[in-house]
Amino acid sequence: MADNLPTEFDVIIIGTGLPESILAAACSRSGQRVLHVDSRSYYGGNWASFSFSGLLSWLKEYQQNNDIGEESTVAWQDLIHETEEAITLRKKDETIQHTEAFCYASQDVEDDIEEIGALQKNPSSGVSSTFTEVLDSACLPEESQSSYFNSDEMPAKHTQKSAGEISLEIADVDESVEKEKYCGDKTCIHTVSDKDGVKDESTSTVEDDANQPNRNRITYSKIVKEGRRFNIDLVSKLLYSQGSLIDLLIKSDVSRYVEFKNVTRILAFREGKVEQVPCSRADVFNSKELTMVEKRILMKFLTFCLEYEQHPDEYQAFRQCSFSEYLKTKKLTPNLQHFVLHSIAMTSESSCTTIDGLNATKNFLQCLGRFGNTPFLFPLYGQGEIPQCFCRMCAVFGGIYCLRHKVQCFVVDKESGRCKAIIDHFGQRINAKYFIVEDGYLSEETCLNVQYKQISRAVLITDKSILKTDSDQQTSILIVPPAEPGACAVRVTELCSSTMTCMKDTYLVHLTCSSSKTAREDLESVVEKLFTPYADIEINKEELTKPRLLWALYFNMRDSSGISRSSYNGLPSNVYVCSGPDCGLGNEHAVKQAETLFQEIFPSEEFCPPPPNPEDIIFDGDDKQPEVPGTNNTVIAKLQSSEESKNLESPEKHLQN
Amino acid sequence: MSMEDYDFLFKIVLIGNAGVGKTCLVRRFTQGLFPPGQGATIGVDFMIKTVEINGEKVKLQIWDTAGQERFRSITQSYYRSANALILTYDITCEESFRCLPEWLREIEQYASNKVITVLVGNKIDLAERREVSQQRAEEFSEAQDMYYLETSAKESDNVEKLFLDLACRLISEARQNTLVNNVSSPLPGEGKSISYLTCCNFN
Ligand SMILES: Cc1cc2nc3c(=O)[nH]c(=O)nc-3n(C[C@H](O)[C@H](O)[C@H](O)COP(=O)(O)OP(=O)(O)OC[C@H]3O[C@@H](n4cnc5c(N)ncnc54)[C@H](O)[C@@H]3O)c2cc1C
Ligand SMILES: Nc1nc2c(ncn2[C@@H]2O[C@H](COP(=O)(O)OP(=O)(O)O)[C@@H](O)[C@H]2O)c(=O)[nH]1
Ligand SMILES: [Mg+2]
């Protein structure tokens, strides 16, 4: 597109993560001219969600991160005047580390052939072909190799290399040429049009029945073929139904761009078993695990928590104790204590005081029933939708969007110390009054004194739920307490296909904890407790009860939350920094940061007020009576207000009558 | 206000290169006017028009790109849950036609597979400057299994027809129960999908 960017803005925002996107919407909404850019080809930065092939391309990017810089960028040095200096930005992203991908699902050659046949129906499509290469360099665990290497075309030397687990980072460059050749005919697999989906499904089912009559088999090529069905979040979060993001979505009307599903279950992991935590009144009464006495004790305790402030005598004496100590005094049986501590209050054993614990429990209970019987919501198509929705709001109010747009440096006026402009990769100078930049874009020099935390993440594709029930469409959250005191609890979120984040008959499982080591070292033990690798199945019959791992990815992500502005070197006063995703379950940090920065920049402006209702803008078209053959049309334009409310479940209070 | 003031609600989404006339098509249809000058209307998110077809009230929610196509930066979420897509090019601009396969790829990636796609060649009032022949466009749309129509937002040619035909098609698709909404509709007993959170729903 031969369209030039304007060169005068009020606010330039670099990075499309959640806080930047909220700020973009807020600024644009208050009448500022906003330019919002991202160096990547997708929205969201580390808040993004990817289709399966998209995720593989993302992985590959980190694998190849080294050879960035060949691109022709116009030198900025000549564009800086004498009275100015430049603060350069980072050339390559360094917020993701230790990526390791594993494929456990079988790589059936026959499947591939079948799909290549199907491909001919739709020769025009051509999504990127990177996935096979990535997979090849990501190593395959030994168990699944037998079927994979049935293919004669597979270079033999790969076999030696893939013993054990080799991370993507150290993929052999020499092999890639050979790999390309091998992939030549496989490349097309995932380009099979969705329009053929139904048909393909039935053919493969037939084939499956022949091969493996007992279990519904998901092969790697099925995952690839249905790759579009996946929306895999880099950061795993949920929305508290009384949380600040929900409030902001509602207030700003950005909620009209996004739909949610309830998290349907809160789970606990105790003594090697996954159990459902009864949290609503109905849950408690229907629970088969709890005895009558336990039910009564739990109900009594939860009811107390809802109004604990009114009964100070019940907890005053325990103010100085930890919440877990306090729970022991409440006649709760060990499993009830576990439920309350880990799954309801979601606090850690050691660090949480009685008051914090009671408060967390109360909050949990108050969130219940706003939208369903757990306090959490999950956005359809993944968390990555949410920043995009704020970006749309910004664009609707005139914000200009430019992905794949790299910024080389800030131009700072020496005298005032204020930033005047950016210079982009075309060498274009774009002026603005305020600049907002995501932490990951700042150079090493700027961040020299910053101490970053890390988040350990795992993404798993599995074939069954970790707790099977009548319905296979459950969305669950599970907190796995640390194995030893002092370590971090691991948060597990299991998404079903109706959240639109994974293909039918699979589950997408996210594990998150704050890092002490690499993601795999931090999370693998929990993965092993809950899942079994695909190929173990034939050998180990009792393992059949566990869901099988089809594919797994581990990575570490930088956690730049909670860094004070003064830790960054030499930031001009009108440059503001947003952090990447934090480790917390909710989005409160991002929302708070966006609001705080907005109020700092524009103290007198309202933060994200509701926009005019689009339905109010509509003109009345009654004067027009178009004639369309075959139909009897009257064109009626309407002024309506949100009748959509009927889509909502009515809020119920489960614990209070 | 009544709860049920329409029989059908469809989300229609416009895409295509910047400058082909998407915004003009929407405004011509919903407001009956051809906006003079360039400036995009600030703050208009989507336009609503309720039409009556064979006695049934059909509410069309028509979404424009908010200009994000200008630098090829449309959000994926824009495509979600669209019932129909209007892919527009400018018959006087070869480039806008050549970009169509790229748009189709984006549709395939992000839109529901049950979405109805209509190809629209706009600005037929500028016939003397035509760069893309009708035949070429017809062949292309046939190969891609799309409906094809040529319009002029300026002269109001075929604009009503475009949207009303689309509404008819959407209704018959809905009748056959193959609409997008079913894909995400929850199975019994599960959390419903929650949309349009509005203030009035709580307290
Ligand atoms: C149902 C529910 C709703 C929640 N809603 C929010 C929310 O809207 N916003 C938010 O920031 N956190 C909320 N939390 C708390 C949030 O889960 C934890 O802060 C988060 O899990 C971090 O845990 P942690 O182990 O790091 O810290 P923890 O040791 O668990 O707590 C860290 C701090 O968070 C505070 N906190 C604990 N629970 C809550 C709570 N319910 N609401 C507010 N503060 C709390 C504590 O007082 C403490 O100072 C909620 C928790 C639950 C169970
Ligand atoms: N002659 C003519 N010009 C049109 C027509 N539709 C749009 N335009 C002009 O094309 C330009 C771009 O239109 P716009 O609706 O903003 O395009 P969009 O970027 O696709 O939304 C404007 O200058 C319009 O006046 C049409 O049917 N005929
Ligand atoms: Mg437009």
From Swiss-Prot, chain B:
A lipid is attached at residues 199-200 (S-geranylgeranyl cysteine). Residues 201-203 form a propeptide. GO terms for molecular function: GTP binding; GTPase activity. It is a lipid-anchor. Disulfide bonds: none annotated. Residues 67-83 are annotated as: Switch-II. Mg(2+) binds at residues 23, 41, 64. GTP binds at residues 20-24, 41, 67, 122-123, 125, 153-154. Transmembrane segments: none annotated. Belongs to the small GTPase superfamily. Rab family. The small GTPases Rab are key regulators of intracellular membrane trafficking, from the formation of transport vesicles to their fusion with membranes. Rabs cycle between an inactive GDP-bound form and an active GTP-bound form that is able to recruit to membranes different sets of downstream effectors directly responsible for vesicle formation, movement, tethering and fusion. RAB30 is required for maintaining the structural integrity of the Golgi apparatus, possibly by mediating interactions with cytoplasmic scaffolding proteins. This is Ras-related protein Rab-30. It comes from Homo sapiens.
